Amino acid sequence: MSMKWTSALLLIQLSCYLSSGNCGKVLVWPTEFSHWMNIKTILDELVQRGHEVTVLAYSPSILPGPNNPSALKFEICPTSLTETEFEDSVTQLVKRWSDIPKDTFWPHFLQVQEMMWTYGDMIRKFCKDVVSNKKLMKKLQESRFDVVLADAISPCGELLAELLKIPFVYSLRFSPGYAIEKHGGGFLFPPSYVPVVMSEFSDQMTFMERVKNMIYMVYFDFWFQAWDTKKWDQFYSEVLGRPTTLFETMAKAEIWLIRNYWDFQFPHPLLPHVELVGGLHCKPAKPLPKEMEGFVQSSGDNGVVVFSLGSMVSNMSEERANVIASALAKIPQKVLWRFDGNKPDTLGLNTQLYKWLPQNDLLGHPKTRAFITHGGANAIYEAIYHGIPMVGVPLFADQLDNIAHMKAKGARVSLDFNTMSSTDLLHALKTVINDPFYKENAMKLSSIHHDQPVKPLDRAVFWIEFVMRHKGAKHLRVAAYDLTWFQYHSLDVIGFLLACVATVIFIITKCLFCVLKFVRTGKKGKRD
């Protein structure tokens, strides 16, 4: 860490201790790539408020920051996997997921489950390397952390919190089929009006869509497993020295910070310890680099289109690139395209290629007219924040579902990346740019996002600090966590009541038979 950052950190810590004395120590178990963007935003704010933040990373981690000047501390745990091997593994998983046919539900999610298990095996290995490292665990124990902040999509943070005997807070976007939320968090998702995540339904479902939604829910609840829970349950039981399960350990989370909000998500019930903090990474646009600003200003009244398929897509076939470039060349707007590859033959004079774009700053520019996006949650939230209509080109994971949400809210047109033609893309761009319907809906979502009593980032930081101050948030924990599945669904009560009713019916029936028998006996005696 440079002298500049060291001095800044010391000043922050000193000011904290001299003022409120409420500075805490936060241990972080993060997830890579776009997940890191969200959690790092929270960590930077915690540091600004004087807290000491330590990020626990495995040696092949490609988190932005460990080798760069930062006020964050990084505790690196050595593993046998190299950084290149880890990055290649993740890249291959992304490519496999992108190549899975999306038109058939069952085969699609069987392959998704296989890939999730592969990823889970890798995370479990990292977790085992951490908890079995006696030197590291002793250091963590002696550091006396106040809270663990973990991304629930990569298990282990809750295990560390259990071993260190400290509370933990989750950050989560979603899990396939809401598995973590339902089984680890006790969340409620009534299938009659809450579409199963990744089903691409809206909350306004037809009868047949509700039938499919129910089937999907049953499939995710009883068949699909995002993680090989038997392996995780066995691993956690061995480490803790007592029988337990992954979801039982997850259920001890004090607060769930869900990276979503009602501008994006469809309404559904929430538990008291769940906070929606979607878009916490969004911020006002900063000035563009001089050369880029000049290109944007040269667009005149037509404005510009921003095109990015995210950081996970590093290459594109020559055929697809030419199809896209051909469509972009035919619009009057200037185009800024994030593209890392050979220059397409059909590239127009109105299009500039960049290996990296200041996406948030471009979306916040007054001359931006539309955003072509893969549908990643971070990108969509930046578009919502700035009120920009979208053309969605989803590739994998939650992107199809995210784009479906934006379609339901009238803020985007979607295309299939593998089958769209140049004409399709051109028509979609003209639609979202020229039809005021899309801009109006995008601005409406932006207005909803900005009209919150507390900003998402401040809300997230508040609850982390709350857990540190109060050593947890047990008063928000619903009693459902202490019930068995049959108690939760009142099956024992229903069984008892049915038994009571059956007993009463039996007694009444028996009495009637006795009375009838008595009456018959009496009549027979009189005849004799």
From Swiss-Prot:
It is found in: Microsome membrane; Endoplasmic reticulum membrane. One of its GO terms (cellular component) is endoplasmic reticulum membrane. GO terms for molecular function: glucuronosyltransferase activity. It catalyses: glucuronate acceptor + UDP-alpha-D-glucuronate = acceptor beta-D-glucuronoside + UDP + H(+). Expressed in several tissues, including prostate, testis, mammary gland, kidney, adrenals and intestine. Its EC number is 2.4.1.17. InterPro entries: UDP-glycosyltransferase, UDP_glucos_trans, UDP_glycos_trans_CS. It holds the Pfam family UDPGT. Residues 1-23 form the signal peptide. Glycans are attached at residue 315. The modification N6-succinyllysine is found at residue 135. It is an enzyme of class 2 (transferase). The chain crosses the membrane at residues 493-513. It is a single-pass membrane protein. Keywords: Endoplasmic reticulum, Glycoprotein, Glycosyltransferase, Membrane, Microsome, Signal, Transferase, Transmembrane, Transmembrane helix. UDPGTs are of major importance in the conjugation and subsequent elimination of potentially toxic xenobiotics and endogenous compounds. This isozyme has glucuronidating capacity on testosterone, dihydrotestosterone, 5-alpha-androstane-3-alpha,17-beta-diol, androsterone, oestradiol, tetrahydroaldosterone and tetrahydrocortisone. This enzyme is essential to inactivation of several steroids. Belongs to the UDP-glycosyltransferase family. This is UDP-glucuronosyltransferase 2B30. It comes from Macaca fascicularis (Crab-eating macaque). The lineage of its organism: Eukaryota, Metazoa, Chordata, Craniata, Vertebrata.
